[in-house]
Amino acid sequence: MMKKALILTSALALSIIAGCSNQDEGTKNGSNSANKEATTKSTNEKKETNNKVSFKDNEAKLNDLKIKITETKVIQVGEKGNEYGKKPVFAIWYETTNLSDKEINPTTGWMAVFKAVQDNNPNSVNTLEIGGLPDDQFLDSQLETIKKDGTVKNAVAYELDDLETPVKLIATQGISGDKLGEQIFNIK
C-alpha cells in the first residue's frame, strides 16, 4: 500500500518536475571515469546555452537541480535494505540540490532524470524496475520539498535481473528530454 502511494505521489510530482527540463543544452564531449566502479560517457549535443547541463563524475547537473551520487551497492534478498524484495537490488545513495524556485523533492528529481538499464537482452532494452527504499532513514524526507539552494539526501534501489551484467544509469534533461550522459556500474 505504501509503495503504491509512493509511486502515485511520485508520478504526480514527475508531471510537475517535467517543467524542470529546459530543452536548451550545452555542448558536452568526452569520457571521464567517476571511480573504480564507474565510467562516464558524455554524449555530444547540438544545442548551446549559457547553462551547462551534464552527467559525469557521479553528478547530474541540470538547470533546476543537481544530483550527486554518493554511494552504490548491491543488496541481496533478505539483507538490510532489501528485507522484503524478491530480487537483489542495486542501491544508490544520492544528494539532490534544488537550484530553482520550483517544488522539487529528492524522489521525483531522481525519477525525472535517471533510468537504469541492464543490457542482458539481445532483442530489447531491459529497463530496471524501482525496488523498495533501501534506507529507512529517508522514509520521512524522500518526498519533502527542497528549498532553493537546499540539499536533501535520499536513496533509490533498482531490482536486478542478474548479478553479472553491469547497470547502465542514463541521465536525461527531464523525463523525455535530451540525453545528458550515461555511467556504467559494475555489480560483481
PLM-predicted stretches and their roles:
Residues 73-91, 103-105, 143-147:
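Short, solvent-exposed beta-strand/turn "edge" segments of beta-rich domains on protein surfaces
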Residues 67, 90-92, 154-156:
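Hydrophobic residues positioned within well-ordered beta-strands of beta-sheet architectures
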Residues 61-63, 99, 117-124, 148, ...:
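A short, structured loop/turn motif at beta-sheet edges
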